[in-house]
């Protein structure tokens, strides 16, 4: 497993060791001990989520307030997404900065997104299935959304040959 710090050092890109042969492939998609060692702290996941989205679906930018702020380990098991992480920690030297990565079933990359970050993604393929582990349970009372096109962040979303589809909550930033 190769772990790389991105432009925002607390966000980590994880690239698994993939073993391929004529039968297909095998890789370890999650190892608690290796992840903890790579990011330098003990993380405990409490919930797994799985979503499916059609091309052009944009989800986010989502986060949860304390005491239910979530760390997330995200990956795509089918299709491809443009994944975005925004630092919303007011006391951070990287506050307001964002990083992006193409996550796909093909490249098998994952992102570790610590607490204090907003997260979203745009589906680039005909559809994509997205899996993520969270460090806190979902809490409707603490759930927040920042509009994907918020002027303070100036995120460069890719242009695609499909209409962008947003939920009402994501459109309004609720």
Regions found by a protein language model. Give the residues of each.
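Conserved metal-binding segment of the jelly-roll/cupin
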Residues: 103-127
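Non-catalytic, conserved peripheral segments adjacent to functional cores
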Residues: 1-106, 127, 134-174
């Amino acid at each position: 497993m190769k772990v790389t710090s991105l432009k925002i050092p607390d966000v980590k890109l994880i690239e698994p060791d993939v073993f391929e042969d004529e039968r297909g492939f095998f890789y370890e998609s999650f190892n608690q001990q290796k992840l903890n060692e790579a990011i330098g702290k003990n993380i405990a996941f409490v919930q797994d989520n799985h979503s499916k989205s059609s091309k052009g679906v944009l989800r986010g930018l989502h986060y949860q307030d304390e005491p239910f702020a979530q760390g997330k380990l995200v990956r795509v098991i089918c299709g491809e997404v443009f994944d975005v992480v925004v630092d919303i920690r007011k006391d951070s030297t990287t506050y307001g900065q964002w990083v992006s990565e193409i996550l796909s079933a093909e490249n098998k990359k994952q992102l570790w997104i610590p607490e204090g970050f907003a997260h979203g993604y745009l589906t680039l393929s005909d559809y994509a299935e997205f899996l993520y582990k969270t460090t806190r349970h979902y809490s409707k009372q603490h759930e927040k959304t920042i509009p994907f096109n918020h002027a303070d962040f100036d995120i460069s979303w890719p242009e695609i040959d499909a209409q962008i589809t947003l939920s009402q909550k994501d459109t309004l930033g609720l």
